[in-house]
A protein has these predicted regions:
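Active-site core segments that coordinate phosphate-bearing ligands/cofactors
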Residues: 6-21, 43-212, 217-292
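A conserved helix-loop-beta module that forms one wall/lid of the active-site cleft
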Residues: 16-37
Length: 292
């Protein structure tokens, strides 16, 4: 149901209106059950299914912890940068959902309150970076010009949901090198992440950020994110996070696994970067207002 989006997330049942919209008979859908203590025998395999959770939710549990209502979990945010990107943090219910952001059901404990998260998304960032020498980019080269950028080829994700702007530059880039363009794209990704973080932090303070996904290994991105958010940032080096999160939920472990983390410390302070971030926010707001 998390993938098909046919479930009414507030009622935890199939949405009649959505099923009608997509012409799906609601009576052919299976019963929605809790995520844990299922105890469904899989006789052909001589196994018992005890836990069911979506891969992204499982990875979130492995990285952040199982109990989003605990302060140690709700004060953390996860930034995953892969094919696309997302910034996610658990929320204490009832929280008003910030306009435009996604509300995600992490899991539904047996006979207990469902656990939710709020999420901002970046679309197709790997595609934007694919042909550029991003590994050669360094923090010192960021904010070295006044060109602003959007780096989401399939359109801006949450909270904007704007398909009219994808890969977009404020000025011509015809005279720039491939590495300079790559740096602009990394700036745009950093600024989108930092703005999502600002919204989350304003609603409820975030004390720690964890980075995961292939693109999060880029030193330039690690440094730029750390400098723009201004709180401790950790790079998660563990593998198979989805499998670890499923095991954590299955065995009802309250904390995340012993994480292989590396704290991102500021290696070279770029004084220009925060100023450009402030200017980028104004540019983006004006850009989106002119094309409503």
């Amino acid at each position: 149901s998390a993938r098909t989006l046919l479930m009414d997330i507030n009622q935890q049942r199939w949405s009649k209106s959505l099923c009608e919209l997509f012409e799906i008979p609601i009576d052919i859908l299976p019963d929605i059950q809790s995520s844990t203590q299922l105890n469904i025998p899989l006789k052909p395999f001589e196994l018992t299914l005890t836990t069911s959770v979506a891969d992204q939710s499982a990875a979130f549990l492995a990285c952040i912890g199982q109990h989003p209502t605990h302060a140690s979990s709700s004060d953390r945010a996860l930034i995953n940068l892969g094919t696309g990107g997302f910034v996610m943090r658990s929320i204490k219910q009832p929280f008003p959902i910030l306009t435009g952001y996604l509300q995600t059901l992490i899991y539904q404990p047996d006979h207990n309150t469902p656990q939710f998260a709020i999420e901002g998304t970046l679309n197709s960032i790997a595609a934007a970076l694919a042909r550029f020498p991003i590994k050669d980019c360094v923090i010192e080269d960021m904010a070295s010009n006044d060109i602003f950028c959007i780096a989401e080829p399939s359109g801006l994700g949450a909270p904007y949901f704007r398909q009219d702007y994808g890969l977009f530059f404020s000025h011509s880039i015809s005279t720039l090198t491939q590495q300079q363009i790559a740096t602009l794209l990394l700036e745009a990704i950093t600024f989108r992440i930092a703005r999502i973080f600002e919204d989350f932090h304003r609603q409820w303070p975030v004390k720690e950020i964890y980075l995961s996904g292939g693109l999060s290994a880029l030193p330039c991105l690690q440094q730029s994110i750390r400098q723009c958010v201004g709180i401790p940032v950790y790079y998660l080096q563990q593998k198979e996070a989805s499998l670890q999160g499923t095991a954590l939920l299955t065995y009802n472990t309250g904390n995340a696994f012993n994480q292989e983390t590396m704290e991102i410390t500021i290696q070279s302070k770029n004084e220009r970067l925060l100023n450009k971030f402030l200017a980028w926010k104004k540019w983006l707001d004006n850009l989106l207002l002119t094309n409503i």
